[in-house]
Swiss-Prot record:
P700 is a chlorophyll a/chlorophyll a' dimer, A0 is one or more chlorophyll a, A1 is one or both phylloquinones and FX is a shared 4Fe-4S iron-sulfur center. Chlorophyll a binds at M683, Y691. The PsaA/B heterodimer binds the P700 chlorophyll special pair and subsequent electron acceptors. PSI consists of a core antenna complex that captures photons, and an electron transfer chain that converts photonic excitation into a charge separation. The eukaryotic PSI reaction center is composed of at least 11 subunits. InterPro entries: PSI_PsaA (IPR006243), PSI_PsaA/B (IPR001280), PSI_PsaA/B_CS (IPR020586), PSI_PsaA/B_sf (IPR036408). PsaA and PsaB bind P700, the primary electron donor of photosystem I (PSI), as well as the electron acceptors A0, A1 and FX. PSI is a plastocyanin-ferredoxin oxidoreductase, converting photonic excitation into a charge separation, which transfers an electron from the donor P700 chlorophyll pair to the spectroscopically characterized acceptors A0, A1, FX, FA and FB in turn. Oxidized P700 is reduced on the lumenal side of the thylakoid membrane by plastocyanin. This is Photosystem I P700 chlorophyll a apoprotein A1. Its EC number is 1.97.1.12. Pfam families: PsaA_PsaB. It is an enzyme of class 1 (oxidoreductase). It comes from Daucus carota (Wild carrot). One of its GO terms (biological process) is photosynthesis. It comes from the Eukaryota. The chain crosses the membrane at residues 70-93, 156-179, 195-219, 291-309, 346-369, 385-411, 433-455, 531-549, 589-610, 664-686, 724-744. GO terms for cellular component: chloroplast thylakoid membrane; photosystem I.
Amino acid sequence: MIIRSPEPEVKILVDRDHIKTSFEEWARPGHFSRTLAKGPDTTTWIWNLHADAHDFDSHTSDLEEISRKVFSAHFGQLSIIFLWLSGMYFHGARFSNYEAWLSDPTHIGPSAQVVWPIVGQEILNGDVGGGFRGIQITSGFFQLWRASGITSELQLYCTAIGALIFAALMLFAGWFHYHKAAPKLAWFQDVESMLNHHLAGLLGLGSLSWAGHQVHVSLPINQFLNAGVDPKEIPLPHEFILNRDLLAQLYPSFAEGATPFFTLDWSKYSDFLTFRGGLDPVTGGLWLTDIAHHHLAIAILFLIAGHMYKTNWGIGHGLKDILEAHKGPFTGQGHKGLYEILTTSWHAQLSLNLAMLGSLTIIVAHHMYSMPPYPYLATDYGTQLSLFTHHMWIGGFLIVGAAAHAAIFMVRDYDPTTRYNDLLDRVLRHRDAIISHLNWACIFLGFHSFGLYIHNDTMSALGRPQDMFSDTAIQLQPVFAQWIQNTHALAPSATAPGATTSTSLTWGGGDLVAVGGKVALLPIPLGTADFLVHHIHAFTIHVTVLILLKGVLFARSSRLIPDKANLGFRFPCDGPGRGGTCQVSAWDHVFLGLFWMYNAISVVIFHFSWKMQSDVWGSISDQGVVTHITGGNFAQSSITINGWLRDFLWAQASQVIQSYGSSLSAYGLFFLGAHFVWAFSLMFLFSGRGYWQELIESIVWAHNKLKVAPATQPRALSIVQGRAVGVTHYLLGGIATTWAFFLARIIAVG
């Protein structure tokens, strides 16, 4: 029996008036650092100011103070998000054709931006249908608004104003919880309470309130919209909420109220909580009744999950106990000590969250097209392509961020003296085996995946198609993927007897959903071409992981530099006296990892874009004949490198290259400009600091001659700064180029 001393009933969890609000201090650049606060001597000062402004670890070593700054900054972030959302809704209310789109979503394109004629750029206002001229948008907001039950621009105005009020509230909260009532460290470390509140509150009640909104507002309004009722004739949301008889006309079970719920006769509610699977043939989106059911189920799960952890009542799980019990036969002390790491190192915590959120974002990308959740989303090809591309890039960046913060944790927060034989220590002790094996896997994947393409290019060049790897010659069918597809396609009659159709049309079966003569979704065939490109995916992902993991595992020490931890997270080289020690810092691994992340995601979005245009997207005739945008050329063209260059990059770039003089010309200019930004990055990546310092000193000499030399001494960028500027422009230029290429193409042909 464990006897615990009685704890005081009320814990004081905040400090009052912790730090005074001082505009004078905020107005002094670099007030958070003694060195920076002195002001600039050289131009390096402005770079250090940006690098360290949010590096709270460098301001103080007091964990409580760091925690408060991070917490306060989160409210600032939320404020910006609300401001951004407000802007999106305001554009929908003020500058868009939302009401026209709502009345005819198959013939009218979504637009929420009208360009003002200043120097003739009103050419950008294309005809999106219904007599409206503006820029076609591909964010998916219109489809989201329709699914939420928004029927007028006035409702968008009200939401925009509401979001502005919330933005102001968040700004106030950020100030209040740092200056007026700052939480104590114990509050940030009370993980059980945090889990309960986040699970039950954010996820549980959040899902429940969304399910409630869907049932009482979205479902009835969408029911009317689908039946072709004029949006102006549809009752307003509060009428559905307050008048049960109105809902009962659409969903008879509403007449019975809550009786079926308390008598456990839940199947009565199956008229608005369904389990159908597949897509609604009217809108090409998931059944909104399925979505409502899903959110209700999720809410129940998370409300239960939010009552599992031990807080004031002495029952439930303790996270420390769970982690310390977590050990297997070959894992030594297992997760012992992990609780302390995750409650004292916010970098470790953030790393874990970024890895999870990044993976989840990529999962979202894949579900948005295979199970399109909003009405008329699946037939808006530009939006589909944009949503996939956007979520893939974001996921890639978040995963690299996970490695970055894992490495910062290793350098700044990891204490090797207190860790022995737990899982992390054991991983670090056999890091050589991990990295060398991973390196072997990368070499194997690289040579074999690329080798298959090179073989095909060679055979194609020699005029020997019968010797190529293709669906019509030597087949390399992705049999495991096809088996998984088939299993899911057959699920409704086997493992999921309650469902009418399988979760996604992409699995297989004969179903095709078309809306307004355009294909929403159909079974996606996988063949040799997909087998080849999937191994390129495997290769690029493994190389990215190799670089990032090496950075984390060797962040503190390596055979080359045993005292690396003393040099910090980012440093250019191990001092001037040691050659061959550049690009070894943990920061440099993140820098290099970003390039491979860019490679990996580029191949994924290229694969997706071409595959969908070739095998899914297109029009359907009255006889039911489908004509795809690129006529199914993916299977035979994408099996050679030449095919990718000729039939994808070059053939599909014609729209962006020929966009001048049309409403798509902005994409042509972006395509050009973003190429320029990308090329500009190479100047930073391929030249050293000394070259620029020499040039600068010559320019300073000229300024002195003319007596216009500045007081602040100009300096070349440091090595690390140059790399940071380089990789930023490389990624920005590359992503913007791809964006212009994709959108000009898909808006023109989609």
